């Protein structure tokens, strides 16, 4: 038997812990990997990426994210924003259980009109493991997943439903 979850949100975590405490230590699979899954839980991404970490690397804090030269990062306890002069060009969302450390989960990149055009997703090792591309209305169109070497391994097309 396996435990199969769409997302590893609070409800899924509670059920998972209840099953473990009840003696049901089944293989657990999460469909939507946010990059911060516990090591004993797999996802389609982690399976196909065959990810391993030889070095002890840590998740990235907001100040470790690369931004274009002369752009500025303004951070607070909830999120960080990226500015090109006085124009907001990005937003860093923190991983909520570790928000007080300002650990980055996603970086949203905006066009000059303020519409989201792409989003980089970072994992617990500080690597960009996925990129989501948005159309001019801000709707997700394509998501690419990368292995630890930055090679594209999975592409999900939201318009056609193909992977």
Task: Tell where the protein language model's regions lie, with residue ranges.
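Glycine/tyrosine- and acidic-biased, solvent-exposed loop/turn segments at the edges of beta-strands
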Residues: 1-163
């Amino acid at each position: 038997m396996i435990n199969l979850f769409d997302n590893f949100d609070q409800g899924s975590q509670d059920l998972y812990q209840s099953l473990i405490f009840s003696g049901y230590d089944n293989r657990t699979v999460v469909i939507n990997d946010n990059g911060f899954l516990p090591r004993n839980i797999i996802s389609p991404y982690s399976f196909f990426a065959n990810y391993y970490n030889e070095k002890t690397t840590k998740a990235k804090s907001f100040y470790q994210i690369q931004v274009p030269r002369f752009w500025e990062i303004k951070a607070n306890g909830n999120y960080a924003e990226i500015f090109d002069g006085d124009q907001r060009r990005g937003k860093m969302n923190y991983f909520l259980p570790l928000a007080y450390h300002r650990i980055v989960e996603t970086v949203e990149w905006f066009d000059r009109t303020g519409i989201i055009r792409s989003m980089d997703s970072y994992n617990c090792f500080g690597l960009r493991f996925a990129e989501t591309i948005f159309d001019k209305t801000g709707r997700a169109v394509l998501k690419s997943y990368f292995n630890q070497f930055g090679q594209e391994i999975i592409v999900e097309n939201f318009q056609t439903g193909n992977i």
